[in-house]
Amino acid sequence: MLLWLADLLGSHIRAFNVFNYTTLRAVMAALTALTISLLLGPWVIRKLTELKVGQAVRNDGPQTHLVKAGTPTMGGSLILLAITLTTLLWADLSNKYVWLLLAVMLGTGALGFYDDWRKVVYKDPKGVSAKFKMAWQSAIAIGAGVFLIATAKLPASTELIVPFFKTVAYPLGAVGFCVLTYFVIVGTSNAVNLTDGLDGLAALPTVLVSAGLAIFAYVAGHAVFSKYLGLPFIPGAHEVVVFCAAMCGACLGFLWFNAYPAQVFMGDVGALALGAALGTVAVIVRQEIVLFLMGGLFVMEALSVMIQVTSFKLTGKRVFRMAPLHHHFELKGWKETQVVVRFWIVTMMLVLIGLSTLKLR
């Protein structure tokens, strides 16, 4: 919106021209989303408490979690509101990627909201069925893939880019691209949701990975920088930086209330949406493999569940004391805050390794 004002009034009021700079709008987007989250957070928590949308706690989980029962959930709605308002304010609304990201995020957020609502209001511990959830996520992911193919301007927009190599890129074709997009978006969405099991555990890694992807988006959207660093040039990808910045600010603001001991939980409405958004950003900037690396924490959490389920079905034995992985370490004696901070440190390391692929090619 402000960029539109800059185009309209820039020739008359020179001060408006500063809004043409992506980096400035990204910084302002982060600050705006952070402010919205901090200001609206107490009100949202009060409303959720009044509605009695309290979190149910697993009886077979760590006993220290029993005190969390009744803590308001669905706080991710605050994150989505902050991201949406901020993006509409600071992003270029003529950019196709902006609308795609909002559509994917809000679409999966609606699924998460419905799932949370069934759990806490209708007292249905299972929420929506796995088939329904997968169908909804699949429709959104495949729709995003079809949209990106239909609007692609350059062959590089649909190639699989291999990090650490300047010239290694595999043409995927329409079907291959849609399949990859499906697995990245749906997989990341569910992986972040599985990670969101401890106070603050999912919020900061989302900030870190989003910030890392924002750097790739800035480079990919700049013809000179992308050529110098050996990345594909994706026209318009620079505007993704504003969305990522809004995500960082919104999640940091939410973390203020979600840090141990949490006053509110993200819920599926936040975790599913943020994961899908991260996956979509990676697909847009053609850095799916880098997302797999930087989001290694999410990958490990998801793999721990798959390994646990598969092992128990085949052998009747469990590999981990409990899945997802963060509960395994809790049952080994780690305090919740130790698990969270150590997982944050691991994510920082993985994001830095991912960023190193910008130059190590």
From Swiss-Prot:
GO terms for cellular component: plasma membrane. The chain crosses the membrane at residues 25-45, 73-93, 97-117, 132-152, 167-187, 200-220, 240-260, 264-284, 289-309, 338-358. Pfam families: Glycos_transf_4. Its main location: membrane. One of its GO terms (molecular function) is phospho-N-acetylmuramoyl-pentapeptide-transferase activity. Catalyzes the initial step of the lipid cycle reactions in the biosynthesis of the cell wall peptidoglycan: transfers peptidoglycan precursor phospho-MurNAc-pentapeptide from UDP-MurNAc-pentapeptide onto the lipid carrier undecaprenyl phosphate, yielding undecaprenyl-pyrophosphoryl-MurNAc-pentapeptide, known as lipid I. Pathway: Cell wall biogenesis; peptidoglycan biosynthesis. It is found in: Cell inner membrane. NCBIfam families: mraY. Its cofactor is Mg(2+). This is Phospho-N-acetylmuramoyl-pentapeptide-transferase. Its EC number is 2.7.8.13. It catalyses: UDP-N-acetyl-alpha-D-muramoyl-L-alanyl-gamma-D-glutamyl-meso-2,6-diaminopimeloyl-D-alanyl-D-alanine + di-trans,octa-cis-undecaprenyl phosphate = di-trans,octa-cis-undecaprenyl diphospho-N-acetyl-alpha-D-muramoyl-L-alanyl-D-glutamyl-meso-2,6-diaminopimeloyl-D-alanyl-D-alanine + UMP. It comes from the Bacteria. PANTHER family: PHOSPHO-N-ACETYLMURAMOYL-PENTAPEPTIDE-TRANSFERASE, PHOSPHO-N-ACETYLMURAMOYL-PENTAPEPTIDE-TRANSFERASE HOMOLOG. Coiled coil: none annotated. Keywords: Cell cycle, Cell division, Cell inner membrane, Cell membrane, Cell shape, Cell wall biogenesis/degradation, Magnesium, Membrane, Metal-binding, Peptidoglycan synthesis, Transferase, Transmembrane, Transmembrane helix. The keyword Transmembrane helix applies. Belongs to the glycosyltransferase 4 family. MraY subfamily. It is a multi-pass membrane protein.
